[in-house]
Every structure is written in C-alpha cells, then in structure tokens.
Design a protein with these regions (language model features):
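Bacterial N-terminal signal peptides that target proteins for export
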Residues: 1-9
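Hydrophobic h-region of N-terminal signal peptides that target proteins for export
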Residues: 11-22
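N-terminal leader/targeting segments
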Residues: 9-11, 61
C-alpha cells in the first residue's frame, strides 16, 4: 500500500471512530418508546411478578439483535429480589447478512421478579436499567441506548 493510500485509510478510520458510528451525531429525541407492564398487576408478598419491557422504535429506527437487549432489576431490601434478563443474538451475523441483525418486530424482554415476603402493602416503584442497541436507517448511525426506568409494583 502506498503512503498516500495508507494516510487516506487512516483518516477514514479516524473519522469513523471519532464520529462514534457511521453517519455522525446522535439524532434528537429518544430512539424508541419503552412500554413497561407487570403481571399480575397486584401481587401478594412472597409472590413472583413478570416484568415485560416492549420496545416500540420510532420511524426510521432499527433495533439490533446483537448485542442483546438487557433488563436489570436490582434487589431492593424489603421489596423485591434482584433479577436480570437478556434477549437477542449472542453474536453478530456475517456482513453479507447484516440486515438479519435488526428486528422486524422487536421481541419483548421479560423477567420474573420475586416480591419480598415482608413487602408492605401499597403502590411502589422499583428502579431498573434497560440497555439496547439501535441504528438510524437513513444515516447508518448506531449506538447503545441506556435507560433508567421505574417499574410500578402494587403489593396487596
């Protein structure tokens, strides 16, 4: 490779790396709406509830299968036990099948959470973290999205 080609390749790689992803800057606004549901809606102390996160991407946004979407619910003493779930692919598809890395319909992420046997009655909010990766179809910009969210928990 000539020095001129090597310099051009170096500039191209540096530009792509410094932009964070192909296509430049992060678009304004959230890439998707997150819908949180809890089943059953009200639980007794000692019971398990299923927390489900549905990702509804905004127009022009593709949600990646790899890396996996991840939901983390830390333990809250006297309220819930910790839980974690991941949904998606364990590895990236080959480049010739790159479109297979995007969901056509995004799978929900569900996790079973144990309500503490000493949990007080009433309405509570449980903090959680949700991470997913997305790409903007028009620009090729791709990035992780890390969201702190709250899970509504009704203890009866």
């Amino acid at each position: 490779m000539s020095p001129r080609h090597a310099a051009a390749l170096g500039i191209l790689l540096f530009s792509a790396a410094s932009a964070g992803a192909p296509g430049g800057a992060k678009p304004a606004g959230d890439p998707a709406k997150l819908v949180v549901t809890v089943n059953p809606p009200a639980a007794a102390p000692g019971q398990e509830v299923e927390v489900v996160i549905r990702v509804e991407p905004n127009p022009g946004i593709k949600v990646n299968r790899y890396p996996k979407m991840k939901l983390q619910v830390p333990a809250a003493e006297g309220l819930v036990g910790g839980a974690e779930a991941a949904v998606g692919a364990s590895e990236m598809p080959p480049l010739e099948h790159a479109e297979q890395n995007y969901y056509k319909t995004v799978d929900p992420v569900a996790v079973k959470v144990s309500v503490d046997s000493r949990a007080p009655r009433g309405a509570h909010t449980v903090p959680a973290r949700f991470t997913y990766y997305y790409c903007v179809a028009a620009s090729g910009y791709c990035a992780p999205e890390r969201v702190s969210l709250t899970i509504p928990l009704q203890v009866r």
